[in-house]
């Protein structure tokens, strides 16, 4: 069975309702994940989660956090078969691109994902993005930094955000998707 490390940086996927709107709360997202039975299904990889401190809105993500994420991957590289980075959507494409150059020569997947709607909401896109990212990170088809969102696996340094309110928020206009997730996950061998 494959082992995947989830690095939770903050962002919409893990936010909860507060008096002042949505906000990330330390420890809350782990409890929410523990209540999703599909994350423990037989076909899922085993996973552990590290929560960054502080949790950030991705508009506050800087080079310092990119270095921290890259160092976490390096520090845990031998213990895991793949990595999922949960990240806010505002700067996810920038982080994916930066990490793709910082982590060159990978033999394992590093998949960035998040959501447009928090997991605490009934219509959240986060559940599918998380589950599919874990499946891809636990597979052997991808060996690079990628961004998975809305059914598409995109090369990390070719993704761009094009919608702030649609559930298909990222595109790769100048490079084909690496995989498409529908009923099955279809990897694009020619990409």
Give residue ranges: language-model regions.
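Accessory alpha-helical/coil subdomains and C-terminal extensions
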Residues: 2, 7-11, 17, 32-41, ...
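Buried hydrophobic positions in well-ordered alpha/beta secondary-structure cores of metabolic enzymes
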Residues: 10-11, 84, 133, 151
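Internal gly/pro-rich beta-alpha loop/helix module
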Residues: 112-182
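Short glycine/serine/threonine-rich phosphate/pyrophosphate-binding segments
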Residues: 15-16, 91-96, 126-130
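Short Gly/Thr/Asp-enriched flexible loops that form oxyanion-binding sites at enzyme active sites
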Residues: 86-108
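ATP/NTP phosphate-donor binding region
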Residues: 1-74
């Amino acid at each position: 069975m494959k082992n995947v490390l989830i690095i939770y940086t903050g962002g919409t996927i893990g936010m909860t309702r507060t008096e002042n709107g949505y906000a990330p709360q330390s420890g809350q997202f782990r409890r929410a994940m523990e209540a999703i039975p599909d994350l423990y299904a037989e076909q899922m990889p085993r996973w552990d989660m590290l929560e960054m401190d502080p949790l950030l809105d991705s508009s506050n993500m800087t080079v310092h956090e990119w270095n921290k994420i890259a160092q976490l991957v390096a520090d845990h590289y031998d213990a895991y078969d793949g990595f999922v980075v949960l990240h806010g959507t505002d700067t996810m494409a920038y982080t994916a691109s930066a990490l793709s150059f910082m982590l060159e020569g990978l033999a394992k997947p590093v998949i960035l994902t998040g959501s447009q709607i928090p997991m605490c909401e009934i219509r959240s896109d986060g559940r599918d993005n998380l589950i599919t990212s874990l499946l891809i990170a636990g597979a052997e088809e991808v060996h690079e930094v990628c961004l998975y969102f809305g059914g598409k696996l995109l090369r990390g340094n070719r993704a761009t955000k094009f919608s702030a309110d649609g559930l298909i928020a990222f595109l790769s206009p100048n490079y084909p998707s690496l995989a498409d997730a529908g009923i099955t996950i279809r990897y694009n061998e020619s990409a």
